């Protein structure tokens, strides 16, 4: 089912289906369902159109999600890089930002290990 520009699965509960939207996790999805008095265990196609419209309105008005949230996060990171603070420098160098060790580990952030290849001896 297409919902706010995203394909949501029909065979999952409403609470789980809402988590397919970027920026909405399980706690937020539960909060949406409880505040609108919607059964979270119901399937998405089983909901009435008014319920779907109320969920859509709630998300659009109260929660940053999808493109808006992605732009906000990207702008925040760009701002850190522009002001050249410690976190911005770490982002620019593709290193861990939150104080993790880098002598070992941090492979996901640093990328594949590059082993220098020794040059052949000339005779």
UniProtKB/Swiss-Prot annotation:
Gene Ontology BP term (one):
translation
The cross-references to SUPFAM superfamilies, in alphabetical order and at most eight, read: S13-like H2TH domain (SSF46946)
Which GO molecular function entries does the Swiss-Prot or TrEMBL record give?
rRNA binding; structural constituent of ribosome; tRNA binding
- Check the record and name the InterPro entries matching this protein: Rbsml_uS13_C (IPR027437), Ribosomal_uS13 (IPR001892), Ribosomal_uS13-like_H2TH (IPR010979), Ribosomal_uS13_bac-type (IPR019980), Ribosomal_uS13_CS (IPR018269)
**Gene3D superfamilies associated with the record:** 1.10.8.50, 30s ribosomal protein s13, domain 2
State the GO CC annotations: cytosol; small ribosomal subunit
Which keywords belong to this entry? Ribonucleoprotein, Ribosomal protein, RNA-binding, rRNA-binding, tRNA-binding
Oligomeric state and partners? Part of the 30S ribosomal subunit. Forms a loose heterodimer with protein S19. Forms two bridges to the 50S subunit in the 70S ribosome.
Give a short account of what the protein does.
Located at the top of the head of the 30S subunit, it contacts several helices of the 16S rRNA. In the 70S ribosome it contacts the 23S rRNA (bridge B1a) and protein L5 of the 50S subunit (bridge B1b), connecting the 2 subunits; these bridges are implicated in subunit movement. Contacts the tRNAs in the A and P-sites.
Could you say which protein family the record assigns here? Belongs to the universal ribosomal protein uS13 family.
Full protein name? Small ribosomal subunit protein uS13
Q: Which organism is it from?
A: Neorickettsia sennetsu (strain ATCC VR-367 / Miyayama)
């Amino acid at each position: 089912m297409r919902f706010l520009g995203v394909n949501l699965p029909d065979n999952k509960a409403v609470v789980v289906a809402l988590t397919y939207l970027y920026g909405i996790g399980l706690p937020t999805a539960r909060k949406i369902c409880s505040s609108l008095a919607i059964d979270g265990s119901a399937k998405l196609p089983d909901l009435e159109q008014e319920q779907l419209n109320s969920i859509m309105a709630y998300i659009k008005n109260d929660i940053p999600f999808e493109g808006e949230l992605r732009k906000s996060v990207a702008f925040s990171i760009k701002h850190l890089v522009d002001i050249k603070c410690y976190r911005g420098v770490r982002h620019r160098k593709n290193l861990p930002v939150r104080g993790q060790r880098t002598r070992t580990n941090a492979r996901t952030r640093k990328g594949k290990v590059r082993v220098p290849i020794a040059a052949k001896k000339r005779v």
